[in-house]
Amino acid sequence: MSKIKANSLTIEFDTFGEPEAKPLLLVMGLGGQMIAWDENFCQQLADAGHFVIRYDNRDVGLTTHFDDHGVPDFKELVVEFMTNGTVKVPYTLDDMAMDGISLLDELGIEQAHICGVSLGGMIVQAMAINHGDRILSMTSIMSTTGNPDLPPAHPKAIEALTSKRVDDPKHAMDRAVEVSKIIGSTGFERDEQRIRNKALESYNRAYNPDGVARQMAAVMAHGDRRPGLNQLKLPCLVIHGDIDPLVPVTGAHDTHQNVPGAELMIIEGMGHDMPKGAWSQIVKGIASLTNQTSATVPRDA
């Protein structure tokens, strides 16, 4: 793992595969550190012909935290939005999208394929909308468009993610297992020990719940991306589980309908996670998409 200065931040990142291969930038979801992209999954993508780049988003992991901005008061944000139609937040999804683009700049990569899950899917959508000339293809996994008319998350899923903060490693592991039972896949084997191990690794590496709150505020402030998605002219794959209780599958259908020419992959039995049993299908879908176009030669950093 390495650090690099980009977009006035210190960004922690990691790579898999050969630099000459197709560049593929992976963007994790709300509060998720880059290690949530399993190394074996990343290696499968590398073996499929990609130069895989995973990184910590701002405010999580080992990338710059925004602690001096405090913790958002979501009740105040709702009132502000209802009153003014906009909200003031520490940073926006557009800022988070620029982080990824700036990372590509510093790595000397002119164009890249991008793939994001959940919040990461929203971020890659913002990348494609704002920096279309830099994007070769977009894969949006278990994400949505910001359409306010779509069904909300299941109350139990929201409760699971907004429950009391963890205060020790054991609590972190136990909570991860409980959350997995509520929002995770039922059509695939659940590896409880793997969930515990990953939760412990994340807790010990960098536990920052205030950063998660600031990321959530960025989501609230971003609004509807459909007008921008309608203008995209790039290969796009939308992947979603049919039983996702946190971001309902209607978000996938809405994304598919609003990105011209997008492909849709609905995985039966998948919830709001990426179970190991679905990796091969996901990797195959991404590889098929990225084969539709090729990157320019990386420029000098």
Regions found by a protein language model. Give the residues of each.
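Acidic catalytic loop of the alpha/beta-hydrolase fold
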Residues: 243-247
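Alpha/beta-hydrolase
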Residues: 153-227, 234, 254
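Catalytic active-site module of serine/aspartate enzymes centered on a nucleophile-bearing elbow/loop
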Residues: 262-301
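Flexible "cap/lid" loop of the alpha/beta hydrolase fold
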Residues: 129, 138-167
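Short glycine-enriched nucleophile-adjacent loop
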Residues: 121-132, 138
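Short beta-strand/loop motif that positions the catalytic acidic residue
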Residues: 232, 238-240
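Conserved acidic catalytic loop of the alpha/beta-hydrolase fold
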Residues: 82, 87-90, 94-112
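Conserved HGGG/HGGXW glycine-rich cap/lid loop of the alpha/beta-hydrolase fold
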Residues: 9-83
